[in-house]
Amino acid sequence: MLAVVADAQQLRQEAFELINLDYPGLEKVKAACSRQKWEAAAQELLNYYRSRTGITHPDIDLKNLTISKEEQKWADDALEHTFFVHKGYQPSYNYGKDINWEYWPVKDNELRWQLHRHKWFTPMGKAYRISGDEKYAKEWVHQYMDWVQKNPLVNMKQEEFELVSAGEVKEDADNVYFAWRQLEVSNRLQDQTCQFLLFCSASAFTPEFLTEFIVNYHRHGAHLLKNYSAEGNHLLFEAQRMVYAGVFFPELKDAAIWRESGINILNREIKKQVYNDGGQYELDPHYHLAAINIFCKALRMADCNGFRNEFPSEYLDTVKNMIAFYANICFPDYTNPCFSDAKLGDYQAELANYRDWLALFPDCDWICLLYTSDAADDSLRV
């Protein structure tokens, strides 16, 4: 199966039309393109990415990678096409030797949507980088190309798309309404930046595959740019992930458009979605928490790559106000009330949030106290 997929890879000449060949560092790529030496151009582009400096990813440190037992299991299971899709459906389902991306063992839309988030891809990347075992990279390339080939982006009827996106179970809905929902598109845009770093050095990551990756990645960005969700936390997720795409791949001609689009939406929506008391307008503790982390993630990605000034000081003030709101609605053990669509949360996860927030607000005494204090001490509410 791996050989079949490898043979199916093509050197996608159109990838070079998507790239700004005048971007610093791409001189050899441009020279090869000018001679129409596409194989040489693809190899030079891969050489460039394997040695690229100047772009920082705040979510991953290749020099200090770790993998949990759970992640290792997801990676190993994925080799047999048993995919971790949803914690609510365990043990995970097997999707067949010839992967069936439309397999729907339980008629829950979340199970169908979240299959297309490829949650096991990043653990496979970690397993590859830590072990050096090419089997993870070969299988990732296989699954990546298999997904591209079996999940084409085709025209969608808006009314059908809205029904499926709203959560109505539509057993007769075309696969595209699940595979290409905006939230899943944005999830792949974000996570594939880490996966790119994890797998780029692999032998299985060929010059031909790189061109396939670029064409597919650009398809995602172009689609999302024209099809953002109308409102709410989904729109925030999509905008933040568009920032990731634009910042991480500045070589793409549309990179600045993507980055600016995401940042503009976040700057607009933080005023629209957050009340004066710091509460996010969907009034759900975990949506509120997600919104905080969305705003913070976009800021971190911009900050470590030279775009911090595209977020005004009011943006940071609002984020801090949101953190204070969240601290005040949580219980002394750092769990939160379970109203609306919220989950309980747990101490370790919430402590990690305060650690990340403290990195953005190092001079904030009360965030420091909430991060370093005993969880049972309820005297620290702000």
Positions of predicted regions on the chain:
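Extracellular glycan-targeting catalytic surfaces
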Residues: 2-230, 236-243
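The feature captures the catalytic groove of carbohydrate-active enzymes
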Residues: 205-209, 236-237, 247-248, 253-306
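Alpha-helix N-cap/helix-initiation motif
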Residues: 177, 231, 280-284
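Conserved adenylation A10 loop of the ANL superfamily
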Residues: 120, 372, 376
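Carbohydrate-active enzyme catalytic cores, enriched for enzymes
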Residues: 279-373, 381
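Surface-exposed helix-capping loop/turn segments at secondary-structure junctions
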Residues: 130-134, 153-160, 276, 302-309, ...
